[in-house]
Each structure stands twice: as structure tokens, then as C-alpha cells.
């Protein structure tokens, strides 16, 4: 089974992936554009990459760039290149994950960035699975764990992608059970993030340029596979985390229809909330970091309750990907009944995502509302 990854390492995703993961998503890195523009040396291979549609040739050029300027600058160069956020670009960026694994082994994972929907992580983890199965994955996750929850949760998500690609798309349940094996093998391994990665991979499941016929998707059933009785209840929450992305495809980007025809009709409250959470994260990359756009798109939710929830999720998503301005602007403009949830989410993220040089007090100063600023400082 592992040999399948070696054969398909460069062809397993060729469709656009639009979720928010967490993720889609780094508006905070837009400031790096100037640095890229100044670095004309990066333009050499990037220009050639953009001039061809042949993936094999693009991989050769990208590898050359990685070797010349280093993995970090190469990833920035590709991100700022203007290449579309399509499956082919996602797949191309797997190259840096392959490179890092081959050169540094499991320790190389920490040099991955989450650009192009964490494709460096995906390429790296797939390579680890092909190289040594669960043992190598565990070694890589050990390095992730040292970096804290914000990093190791993302690694677990990438591992979930790899488990399904390795098992084969018809073996969705097997991949989910492999996540359970990982929980028993690796300390602090977050099961939900792995399940989430499995279900996200099931949505895209692309081989040779078209969705695999083996993926668990029914175009006439927007609740499938979350309503499939073969899937254990403990996995269903992660299924609903991704279902809005699938429905968004089915309804050709009609956010209001996804909200009213899919999420609003989910009967169990826990699953319904996760559906709206997934839809809010689907909205996040569409906002382009603009608080006004967030408020506009979230107004498409079917009630004020879900409107506020959508706004709060987007504020948190913006903070998680590095934006230190928009989240505070978003919470300042949410309706009064939504402020507690919005600011509460941001304040908890400030602690969870605190970086060495960040000063909480200076971040609190960005809260424009005095009462909430005091709560932030306390």
C-alpha cells in the first residue's frame, strides 16, 4: 500500500481546494510581497514555472529554486508569484515537503510553511508514510509537538490527508481508524484534526486531473457521507467540519443556499454548529482580510445568532493566520450581543498563538472599545 504513495506522490491532488482551514489563508503574510519584489533572483525560476503548464517541468524548476535560495525563501517566492490557488499549484508545493524530508528527515517538517493550503506539510507527511509508515510519521509529529498546539494540530491534519491518500479513497473508514492508531502511538496526538484531514482529503480526492470515483461523495445528497451509518459517531463532527466546503461546490459558491439548505437543516445542535463553523471558514479567504467584507458575507446567515457566530469565527481565523489588525476591527463592528463571543475568541487566541516577540498589552491596545480593552489587559 505504501508503494502507491511513491507512485502518486505528485498526482494525488489536482483540483482547487478552497477551505479555510485555519487555513487558507495567511493575510498576515501579504506584507512579504515587498520582500519578494526586491528579490529578483527568485524571479528567475518563478518566471519559468509560470511559463509552463507541465507539472514535471515545474517540479524541476521549483527544486532548482529551493536548492538555490533555500526552502523558506522558495516557499515565499511561490506564494507571491501570482500562481493561482489551484490543485496543481498545491501539488507543486508538495515538492518542498519532499525536499525537506529527503534532506533533513523528520526534523525537516518544521521548515514547512502553511502556504497553498499546507501543501508542504502534505508532501512531507506523504513522504514519511511512504518511507517508514507510522514510525516515521511519529518521529515527524514529535518535532511538531515541540512547537506547541498551533503547530502540532496542523501536522495532525496533514497526517489525516496522508492516511487517506495512502489507504485509497474507497477506504475512508480505514483511514479514520488509522488516526485512532496514531492516537495510541503518539503522545498528545489530536484525533479530531486527523479525522478532519481525512474528510477534507475525501472531498478533493483527485487523481490524474479529476475526482476519484472512489471518494465518498454523492452529488444528490448534501449530507453524505456525514449521514452514512457505516461511519462511527465519533468521526461525524469532523465530517460536518468539511461538509460546507462540499456543498459550496455543489451550489456553485452560493453561501446563502449552503447556510439555509444544508447547515440550518442539520438536526443535532453540535453538528449544526460545526457546519456553520465550516461555512464561516469557507467565507474567510473570500474576505481578503477586510472586516467590512466579513460582515457583508456573514450577513448571509439565516439568523442573527449564526451571523454573529460567523463573524466571530472569522475574527478568530484571521488572528490564527497572523492578522493582528482585522480581528479587532471585526469584533468592534459585530452586533452588541455578539461581542462577548467575538472578543472572548480573540483573547483566547492571543494566548494560544503568542509569539516570542509579541506583547499582549500592545495587542490589547488595538481594542478600540475601552471596556473590552480593560478585559483584554486583565
Where are these predicted regions, by residue range?
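N-terminal Sec-pathway targeting helices
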Residues: 2-18
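Non-catalytic tandem-repeat scaffold regions and their flanking low-complexity/translocation tails
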Residues: 12, 25-378
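Sec-dependent, cleavable N-terminal signal peptides
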Residues: 19-23
Amino acid at each position: 500500500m505504501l508503494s502507491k504513495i511513491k507512485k502518486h506522490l505528485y498526482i494525488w491532488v489536482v483540483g482547487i481546494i478552497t477551505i479555510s482551514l485555519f487555513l487558507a489563508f495567511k493575510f498576515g503574510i501579504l506584507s512579504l510581497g515587498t520582500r519578494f519584489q526586491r528579490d529578483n533572483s527568485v524571479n528567475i525560476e518563478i518566471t519559468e514555472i509560470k511559463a509552463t503548464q507541465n507539472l514535471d517541468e515545474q517540479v524541476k524548476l521549483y527544486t532548482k529554486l529551493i536548492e538555490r535560495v533555500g526552502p523558506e525563501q522558495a516557499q515565499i517566492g511561490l506564494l507571491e508569484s501570482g500562481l493561482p490557488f489551484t490543485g496543481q499549484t498545491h501539488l507543486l508545493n508538495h515538492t518542498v515537503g519532499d525536499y525537506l524530508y529527503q534532506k533533513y528527515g523528520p526534523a525537516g517538517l518544521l521548515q514547512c510553511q502553511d502556504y497553498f493550503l499546507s501543501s508542504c506539510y502534505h508532501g512531507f507527511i506523504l513522504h514519511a508514510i511512504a518511507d517508514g509508515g507510522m514510525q516515521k510519521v511519529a518521529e515527524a509529529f514529535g518535532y511538531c509537538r515541540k512547537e506547541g498546539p498551533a503547530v502540532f494540530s496542523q501536522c495532525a491534519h496533514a497526517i489525516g490527508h496522508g492516511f487517506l491518500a495512502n489507504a485509497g479513497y474507497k477506504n475512508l473508514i480505514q483511514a479514520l481508524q488509522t488516526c485512532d492508531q496514531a492516537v495510541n502511538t503518539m503522545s498528545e496526538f489530536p484525533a479530531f484534526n486527523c479525522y478532519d484531514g481525512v474528510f477534507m482529503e475525501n472531498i478533493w480526492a483527485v487523481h490524474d486531473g479529476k475526482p476519484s470515483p472512489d471518494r465518498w461523495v454523492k452529488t444528490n445528497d448534501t449530507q453524505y457521507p456525514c449521514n452514512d451509518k457505516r461511519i462511527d459517531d465519533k468521526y461525524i463532527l469532523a465530517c460536518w467540519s468539511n461538509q460546507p466546503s462540499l456543498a459550496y461546490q455543489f451550489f456553485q459558491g452560493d453561501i446563502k443556499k449552503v447556510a439555509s439548505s444544508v447547515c440550518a437543516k442539520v438536526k443535532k445542535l453540535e453538528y449544526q454548529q460545526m457546519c456553520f463553523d465550516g461555512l464561516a471558514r469557507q467565507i474567510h479567504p473570500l474576505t481578503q482580510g477586510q472586516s467590512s467584507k466579513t460582515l457583508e458575507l456573514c450577513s448571509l446567515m439565516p439568523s442573527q445568532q449564526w451571523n454573529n457566530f460567523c463573524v466571530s469565527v472569522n475574527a478568530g481565523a484571521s488572528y490564527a493566520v497572523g492578522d493582528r489588525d482585522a480581528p479587532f476591527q471585526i469584533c468592534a463592528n459585530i452586533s452588541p450581543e455578539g461581542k462577548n463571543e467575538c472578543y472572548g475568541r480573540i483573547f483566547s487566541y492571543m494566548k494560544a498563538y503568542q509569539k516570542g516577540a509579541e506583547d499582549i498589552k500592545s495587542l490589547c491596545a488595538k481594542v478600540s472599545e475601552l471596556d473590552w480593552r480593560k478585559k483584554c489587559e486583565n
